Amino acid sequence: MATLERLLDLLREYHLDDVLFHNSTPELGIQHRSRPKQKRIIRGKKQQKSKKLKRNEQQQPFPKGDLETLRRFSVTDVKISKQSTKWAKKMADKHLEIIRKHCKTNSIKLFNHFEYTGSFYEHLKTIDADELDIMVALSIKMDELEVEQVTPGYAGLKLRDTPSNRNKYNDLTIADNYGRYLSPEKVSRWFFSLVQKAVNTYKDEIPQTEVKLTDNGPATTLVITYREGDKPQEKNRRLSIDLVPALLFKDKTKPAGDDLRAWHYVAKTIPKGARLKEPLPFRSELLWRQSFSLKEKHLMDKLDKDDNGCRREMVRIVKTIVKKDPTLAQLSSYHIKTAFLQYNFSDVKLDWEGKKLAERFLHFLEFLRDRVKDKTLNNYFITDLNLLDDLNDSNIDNIANRLDKIIQNETERAKIFTTQRQ
């Protein structure tokens, strides 16, 4: 009898008693296991399986459509706190107002005003509010210059040969056989000197604040270090402000809203090593780059307002990934913004509802990868200006392969999204 009871215990342990004794067997003193108990056993198996799936999901936390992972990454690694944004704006406004007044007083014929552009003012800045971009609008008028379009995106700005112009801007121009051209380098040096004098007048008057000025190519960079603060996170904070001279022209013969009505040029020349389709028939150091910063800001201002979409959040996530990845970091913020403009403002209607963030994210990465593979990412406003001409073929191939790996491989994506902000 003991042997029989041992056998029954073994059958129950391996859940075989229902198979052998599917009917009651009173002669052996065996009662058939009740159905509710059997259901509890089956439910227990499902729970074990569910836990196993969850463990697998934790190992691969970004399957397609995983909105939660993107949202979490956006909060922990991408978004800038309101306090940080408020601090940067307050600090910038304080210093820029002093500089603006000095420039207005000491260079009334040349300095006009500041234009607040770039990712901070487009609400596309990520990680930290530590860099700002300002266009310095000069007072030179369009009817004083002849714009000579030399290559897509770049132009020479020649002073018109008129009696009123003959003694103007002598310190800012370079003469050649064709006339006098406004020099980006000379204009940048002039503005640096003007701002340096402004900074010297007040840098020792603001307590707990160190102000330095650096010559960063075409930009005059104001570096503000705040040594003390009411809050721990404010101590030793740095804010870098790039100030770039610009000419903002309006062709009044064109109707309002016409893309050709506004012509903006900044004191930035062609990058060294840029691949050009044809040799320049012009001295490259005299070229000014055409700018669309104000138009881009206008487009970005409208984002997500009508449909409460996730466009800005998606762009910020991509920018953060690109910035942190050694291979992708060869792409500039402007590359990402240009690709987004093409992607968002195409003829294809996209669903930007918040719950579609993960779908839009992967789809945009595919769009960017395809542009890079084709080695063609044209300026949104100048379709024959390829922004990838600044990169060599080897780097472009590496970027394309890296994007492809992130898109196709969930493990690679997991590595990106588990990296926390330092």
From Swiss-Prot:
Location (main, coarse): cytoplasm
Binding site for Mg(2+): E131, D133, D242
EC number annotated for this UniProt entry: 2.7.7.86
InterPro entries named among the record's database cross-references: Mab-21-like_nuc_Trfase (IPR046903), Mab-21_HhH/H2TH-like (IPR046906), MAB21L/cGLR (IPR024810)
Enzyme class: transferase
Cofactor requirement: Mg(2+)
Name of the featured protein: Cyclic GMP-AMP synthase
Presence of keyword Transferase: yes
Similarity comment: Belongs to the mab-21 family.
GO cellular component: cytosol
Localisation per UniProt entry: Cytoplasm, Cytosol
Segments of this protein annotated with the region Disordered: 29-64
Binding locations of GTP: T117, D242, R289, Q290, S291, F292, S293, L294, K295, E296
Function: Nucleotidyltransferase that catalyzes the formation of cyclic GMP-AMP (cGAMP) from ATP and GTP. Catalysis involves both the formation of a 2',5' phosphodiester linkage at the GpA step and the formation of a 3',5' phosphodiester linkage at the ApG step, producing c[G(2',5')pA(3',5')p]. Acts as a key cytosolic DNA sensor, the presence of double-stranded DNA (dsDNA) in the cytoplasm being a danger signal that triggers the immune responses. Binds cytosolic DNA directly, leading to activation and synthesis of cGAMP, a second messenger that binds to and activates v1g246111/STING.
List of residues binding ATP: S119, E296, K319, S333, Y334, H335, I336, K337
Cofactor note: Binds 1 Mg(2+) ion per subunit.
Molecular function (Gene Ontology), one example: GTP binding
Organism: Nematostella vectensis
Reactions that this protein is recorded to catalyse: GTP + ATP = 2',3'-cGAMP + 2 diphosphate; GTP + ATP = pppGp(2'-5')A + diphosphate; pppGp(2'-5')A = 2',3'-cGAMP + diphosphate
Keywords on record: ATP-binding, Cytoplasm, GTP-binding, Magnesium, Metal-binding, Nucleotide-binding, Nucleotidyltransferase, Transferase
Basic residues bias spans: 32-54
One Pfam family here: Mab-21_C
Superkingdom of the source species: Eukaryota
